[in-house]
Amino acid sequence: MENSKKTPLFTVYEKHKGKLIDFGGWAMPVQFEGIIPEHEAVRSNAGLFDVSHMGEVEIKGKDALNFVQYLITNDASQMEKNQIIYSFMCYENGGVVDDLLVYKFEEDYFYLVINAGNIEKDYEWMLKQSTAYDVEVNNISNDVSELALQGPKAEKILQKLTETDLSQLQFFYLQRDVTIDGVNCLISRTGYTGEDGFEIYVNPSDAVQLWEKLLEVGQEDGLKPIGLGARDTLRFEAALPLYGHEINRDITPLEAGFGFAVKLKKEVDFLGKKALIEQKEAGLTRKLVGFEMKDRGIPRSDYEVYHQGEKIGFVTTGYFSPTLKRNIGLALIDAKYAELGNEVDILIRKKQVKAELISKTFYKKNYKK
């Protein structure tokens, strides 16, 4: 852990009894009080996450929109100022470089939020693709700290510290230069939990002050610090993908069921478009499905999936769901077996254990309308 990178909030983890792990080269808290109580706090009240390990890249210049359009699968041409879209960057073969959020500040100024473990790879990828465009591509990850305040009471808690009317900020929109407890912030109504909430971007020197103040004013509303363990169970219940699990360089967004963020009809020949069109026209041979264990056993990532003795795929994520109180999972399997209600077997400790395919909508998301 000594060689791991540390966020500006590393100094407060011990105070809040954070248990540390190495996550993508970062020393991060996997839990504070415990994964299940933290998970339940976010579903019922609110939770505060340190997500300063995430990456931020600025795209600026005359060709900013054209470059972003070439880089991503979604369509940025229809974005309003201060709007956000979810998207993928793909390789030419349709596999995923990363999933990301695209923030539009101005017509010539975009801000991309990328996964912590992919920062160097993504930045090099963007630089390599940018040579034909009149743009600046700046990795500003070290200049930004990010906190996520998530849960049904997130707005109530954050409103105590700002004069900005947060009820006016719509889902997947941002506001710049918001003052929170005297600190200048960028806030967006986004998150990775399936709940309403905010992601707050601040100067690293202000991160500790803001973290401590939020926990102080949120205490009466049940706000708790949340580690990466509950962050993963929350995103999993909401069927949100994690890079390296539901998506990677060998799994396309279409196979993973995220076609809504892939605009094959947009005029720009974006990276991976040809391969994705061909895959759609030929028909998917693999699909991401949800499943529930029928017999005892918790499914885990990379466990093999069988149908009548034939291996048909693998588990991408599996957990005991704290909300549903059931053992459930996501798996990438042969499309011909992907019908809801089908019985499959998950290989758990060398034993095939029965499961049934169910909708991936494990949990109804509670986003602000």
From Swiss-Prot:
The record's Gene Ontology cellular component field reads: cytosol; glycine cleavage complex
Gene Ontology BP term (one): glycine decarboxylation via glycine cleavage system
Q: Which UniProt keywords apply?
A: Aminotransferase, Transferase
Matching Gene3D superfamilies: Aminomethyltransferase beta-barrel domains, Aminomethyltransferase fragment, Probable tRNA modification gtpase trme, domain 1
The reply on keyword Transferase is yes
* NCBIfam families, per the entry: gcvT (TIGR00528), PRK00389.1 (NF001567)
Protein name, UniProt field: Aminomethyltransferase
What is the source species?
Alkaliphilus metalliredigens (strain QYMF)
